[in-house]
């Protein structure tokens, strides 16, 4: 009897190990920061969790960090570089597909980066992900490079993001260009998401729903899944 139970458990574990894994790698809008508050949306309200609910045959892994940038570190917030941390995530989680949604923090006035430079950095991160290999993985990782939506220079973030609005409106164009150059899938989050108009950076709860709904069919197509 014990052997039968053990076999059933082993079979279930093997089946689960064969499920496609999707890594959502982003910043505070992946982490779930609530606009104009110190709080965080509940785990079931954030867009990665909504993807996990909709994609029942996929394991969605949430990897968001407040203040995360593409390459540069904040002078007083420690190591927030996505480039520095992503490799550890790839080794730990062994994803089949990685969704990269970064670039908003790189628009901060202190970094003095153009929209072109931000997009080029994001594409560089995507390309390194495509090229990542480890012994236990016999195929390349697929990547969906997502351009963040526009930001607004309002409220408490106005000074920090001085000059960022105009740059943010150009991100999708450059992200699409560089994604095409490296043979990477692309999506413009700004086509479905708008940040809180009073706060300018973070998303209200319905925007998480809009993004998840838009990404579900794209993910299914990229993973070769139907229905």
Where are these predicted regions, by residue range?
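Serine-esterase "nucleophile elbow" of acetyl-processing enzymes
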Residues: 2-65, 73-74, 88-90, 209-210
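Active-site beta-alpha loop architecture of Rossmann-like, nucleotide-cofactor-dependent enzymes
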Residues: 32, 69, 105
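Short secondary-structure boundary/hinge segments and terminal tails
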Residues: 69-71, 196-197
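Structural motif
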Residues: 70-81
């Amino acid at each position: 009897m014990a052997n039968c139970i053990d076999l059933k458990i082993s079979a279930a574990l093997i089946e689960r190990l064969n499920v496609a894994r999707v890594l959502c790698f982003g910043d505070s809008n992946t982490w779930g920061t609530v606009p104009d508050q110190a709080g965080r949306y509940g785990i079931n309200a954030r867009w990665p969790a909504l993807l996990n609910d909709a994609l029942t045959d996929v394991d969605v892994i949430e990897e968001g960090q407040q203040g995360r940038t593409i390459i540069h570190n904040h002078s007083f917030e420690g190591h927030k570089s996505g480039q520095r941390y992503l490799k550890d995530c790839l080794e730990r989680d062994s994803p089949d597909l990685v969704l990269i949604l970064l670039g908003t923090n790189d628009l901060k006035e202190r970094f003095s980066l153009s929209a072109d430079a931000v997009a080029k950095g994001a594409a560089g991160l995507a390309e390194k992900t495509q090229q990542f290999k480890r012994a236990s993985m016999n195929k390349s990782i697929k990547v969906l490079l997502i351009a963040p939506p526009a930001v607004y220079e309002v409220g408490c973030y106005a000074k920090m993001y001085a000059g960022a609005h105009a740059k943010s409106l150009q991100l999708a164009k450059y992200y699409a260009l560089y994604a095409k150059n490296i043979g990477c899938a692309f999506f413009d989050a700004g086509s479905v998401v708008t940040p809180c108009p009073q706060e300018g950076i973070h998303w209200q709860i319905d925007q998480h729903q809009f993004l998840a709904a838009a990404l579900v069919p794209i993910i299914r197509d990229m993973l070769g899944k139907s229905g």
